[in-house]
Amino acid sequence: MEQYQVTGMSCAACSARVEKAVSSVEGVTSCSVSLLTNSMGVEGTADSSVIIKAVEDAGYGAKKKGVQTQSNSSDADLLKDRETPVLKKRLITSLCFLIPLMYLSMGHMMWNWPIPKILDGNHVAMGLIQLLFTTIIMVINQKFFISGFKSLFHKAPNMDTLVALGSAASYGYSVYILFAMTDAQMHQNMDAVMKYMHEFYFESAAMILTLITVGKMLEARSKGKTTDALKSLMKLAPKTAVVIHNEQEIEVGIEQVHQGDIFVVKPGENIPVDGIIIKGNSALNESALTGESIPVDKKEGDAVSAATLNTSGYLKCEATRVGEDTTLSQIIQMVSDAAATKAPIAKVADKVSGIFVPTVICIAIATMIIWLLVGQSFGFALARGISVLVISCPCALGLATPVAIMVGNGMGAKHGIMFKTAVSLEETGKTQIIALDKTGTITSGKPQVTDMVPVEGISEEELLSIAYALEKKSEHPLAHAILQKAEEAQIHDNLEIKNFLAVAGNGLSGKIDKETVYGGNQRFIEKYAKIPLSMIKKSEELANQGKTPLFFACDEQLIGIIAVADVIKEDSPQAVKELQNMGIRVVMLTGDNERTAKAIGKQAGVDHVIAGVLPEGKESVIRDLKEKGKVAMVGDGINDAPALTRADMGIAIGAGTDIAIDAADVVLMKSRLSDVPAAIRLSRATLKNIHENLFWAFIYNIIGIPLAAGAWYMLLGWKLNPMFGAAAMSLSSFCVVTNALRLNLFKMHDASKDQKIKNSVVLEEIQVQNITKQEEKTMKKTMKIEGMMCGHCEAAVKKALESLEGVEEAIVSHEEGTAVVSMTNEVSDDVLTQTVEDKDYKVTEIE
């Protein structure tokens, strides 16, 4: 998407006009204009010069934005609130002339305030003074007239057109009255003079401009606050870096740093670009990027990101990503792109904004004609028409959605939750089913030692020492868990392994002095050592908890079991509970076998588990789930891309510095599952805010325009002075923007106010295991089986056993050589044995 800066827009009608003009350019596939940031996002093959010309032909200005990181500062300058100081200056100057004008025009009539003697009784002079003050105020606020009439001539009237027409009509009619009064004065017709004196609308013309300026200033200040998050991100970009050239440290501009350059960072300095530490260690404060305030320890080989703060050590790093490729630049681009897109809910407001101003002008003209036809004076009819013009506000409609999107997106970015588009921010909260990938999402993705069970006579330290000596020569992921546990226990044993042998998928063996040691699964160890029944039961207990039991033996004697598991993240159960409290069905996807999957699922508290799903099979599962309701898929983005893309909403968790995950609609920079319900809360709060804004914008115009037209005058005697209409218009947009700013106070991690949406989704037809029901089992038997070699063997034995009447479930493991059979009715050992052996496997024992 190419980004453009657009100038000259003042209201929603302007942005609608620009969007329509650019969308009609050949080669443009999509165009989205943001009145809030005065920016435009364009997709397609059209040349930028053609796009800029289309904008200029529509009566506005445009220029293409730069994309380099060094432009972050200039982009921040583009977002700087330059409008408020200008409007403030105009307002103060206008008030200097408006106050005496109001004193002269209304003070003596309404409150009997004294007027200067030179003007007392001199009605023509009084009119001329009002004419002078009003003319000065109109010159001060000439922007309304230049923009308004220019847009009118381009056949694209906007809010400024309404203001300009209303003020100009008041001014023109008052000038006519002044001439008529002068003529009456010359003919000594004092009754006519007094009548004309009360028909001046100079104060209305001036007050309309001043009040609209007040509203514009309040709106500009509020709009400036909505982009604070984006501006603060842009200002984080470091301006310089210290690089090493010819063994000397040289400070250079950030744009001069290239990939592969070596740079240094001292304590208290920010990392200039993304890189890898090649020397030194430190703790980095990454709160600017992830929202996590606790410093993260970094050592040689670890990645560092631009804009993070080096709190302690001296670091020497190699630049890996510079310019627009840094994490910070990608975040800025993502927030900017989201601001440039439009949520589906904005389409109604956009359609209304496109025809709003012409419709209002027609209503104003019709109002005047109707009042003249029913016999009212021209002055009365004109006042009603002017009131219609100045009370109508297309800006409130146009700002209702983008201000909420900008604030919501900024809030998310502060907490490491990145919504790529306005659509993703709106739609995430509508999720009915959440599919969670197990590894890296519910669990940490890093196996850890959870239990150590030494046999009698062996200490935990002795067991861990032998396991450490054996496993340190292995490359298996489970071996790393044992090595980490040994390091934590400060075991630095000098036991040396000789004749090391690794049997793929089974275990390890080697010699320590004259003793042979073994480590591996139950089936492997049984070949070399007798395993007591108590230890077999313990291993089954551990397996039922979702853990992998590793057996260790020394010279035909079992010395113990070490259980390893990919442990559940600390916040996962609470996050799942929060999702369920929101009325969302939570499904876990995993490639694990049923027993392990169900154990993890129970710990996490999910509604359903789908086990045995390979990475390539996740996409088809998501397709099935989508038939039941709106699905969000949460994964780490590494092997989940097809599933993330297939889901209604793809959420990549734990992205860290790699936020450019194309398949994801929402990117969570931290690995906390609790950020998923937080993202849904923020989405729901933003959508609610948009609904409030749209309601206010529509109801304001629906009530205000008939009131201004005098619809209630004949019945209740209500009529609206144009000045009060202008005051209402000036406050309408301010109210909308201020309401959106309330999102800054929203606590997205607070679950106390969660509302449970009505969810009629039923998942029974999908091949899932419902783990929330208490399973009633009258008997359980464990069969030891030889001959099973793979998953197909497991499936064959499982299918055979579960075909028996009375067998409710059979959990089969070829690695452990066991089948745990759950029965609701008694099934004899002979029947179980015969059933398995008919499949060419051997049953050695049943317990």
Where in this protein do the model-derived segments appear?
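Conserved cytosolic catalytic loops of P-type ATPases
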Residues: V25-S49, K53, E199-F200, K231-D325, ...
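Transmembrane helix-loop-helix hairpins at the membrane interface
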Residues: V86-T240, K351, M452, G717-P722, ...
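Conserved ATP-binding TGD loop and adjacent catalytic N/P-domain core of P-type ATPases
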Residues: A16, T29, P267, T431, ...
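Juxtamembrane coupling segments of multi-pass membrane pumps/enzymes
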Residues: M181, M190-A192, A206-P267, K298, ...
